[in-house]
């Protein structure tokens, strides 16, 4: 089976928020026989909510057959420096967990960095060796 990873800082599941484009895209790819995992921050954008990672670097959940990985990030409020720190913590957290996640669940064939902010696209480039 082919594996496809989607990196989007603000992606949510139907249970965690309204930003579902990546969830629905993953469902569509699953119907086509492509195992798709969505990676997102555990601090939920525009809701003030947070997915508890239980003190671990990430929490893997599955909703309606779509694996979601919530990466532990710093809390933020508004559009100030705390939000920039949150973006950086997602970037660094995702880099930190990716190789171990690939070892445990299988390497991706494709990585898509969905551009929520400038750091998002760098993930795919920096993790190209995972697809080799």
Please annotate each region the language model reported.
Residues 1-64:
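N-terminal subdomain of nucleotide-sugar transferases
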Residues 19, 106-109:
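Intrinsic disorder/low-complexity signature
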